[in-house]
Amino acid sequence: MTTPNPGQRLGLLGRKVGMMRIFTDDGDAVPVTVLDVSNNRVAQIKTVETDGYSAVQVAFGARKASRVTKPEAGHLAKAGVESGELLQEFRVSAEVAAECKPGSQLPIAMFQAGQQVDVQGTTIGKGFAGTIKRHHFGSQRASHGNSRSHNVPGSISMAQDPGRVFPGKKMSGHLGDDTVTTQNLDVVRVDEARQLLLVKGAVPGAKGGFVTVRPAVKVKLKKGAN
């Protein structure tokens, strides 16, 4: 396992289109998630001298001018960039930041087929959920003396000592709507004409949800590689 320089992890913002399957030359079916990463534009370059750190601010998507606050509209107009639905920073090295210019487009060609990437998204919200759905608890007995305690978690603490419920106890509560990163997904295909990335497997979030695609930070070596 190798770890690339974190300063080189400039990525792309996108939207989850959905899942499908494609077939390899050998006839194997591969499940893939289609990501739309079109129109990623540089909104600002941050440097150590002016901001205390190096970063590239990227805008994605389109938004009506009436839906943009005046400070953000002025900030984007300074770089000559149209307003977007998403505005996010990527912490990079000074060398990488120097290669980007405000108003320029980030090419999808920065990713290649066979490369491993980390995809971050917001999981689907499930609302208030019980312990069976939230923590995969098992149900209690359906009969044999069990009365109205089929799906309850059971005891949540001990006795007078310690006399409290320990923090972190698995109980009912809100499920989903979390920021999750799925690591080491293989890029199966890069469609430059339609600005689409096809990555193997599932990606966090619902259709239409925003995602962030970065080069994998924990690259797994293929079998047989030195």
Swiss-Prot record:
> Which InterPro entries does this one have?
Ribosomal_uL3, Ribosomal_uL3_bac/org-type, Ribosomal_uL3_CS, Transl_B-barrel_sf
Do the record's keywords include Methyltransferase?
no
Its GO biological process annotations read:
translation
- A single GO cellular-component term on record: cytosolic large ribosomal subunit
**Record key words, sorted:** Methylation, Ribonucleoprotein, Ribosomal protein, RNA-binding, rRNA-binding
Output the Gene Ontology terms for molecular function: rRNA binding; structural constituent of ribosome
N5-methylglutamine: which positions carry it? Q160
How is this chain modified after translation? Methylated by PrmB.
Pfam families in the cross-refs: Ribosomal_L3 (PF00297)
Briefly state the protein's biological role.
One of the primary rRNA binding proteins, it binds directly near the 3'-end of the 23S rRNA, where it nucleates assembly of the 50S subunit.
Query: In which family does this protein belong, per the annotation?
Result: Belongs to the universal ribosomal protein uL3 family.
Q: How does it assemble?
A: Part of the 50S ribosomal subunit. Forms a cluster with proteins L14 and L19.
| Protein name per Swiss-Prot or TrEMBL | Large ribosomal subunit protein uL3
Species assigned in the record: Leptothrix cholodnii (strain ATCC 51168 / LMG 8142 / SP-6) (Leptothrix discophora (strain SP-6))
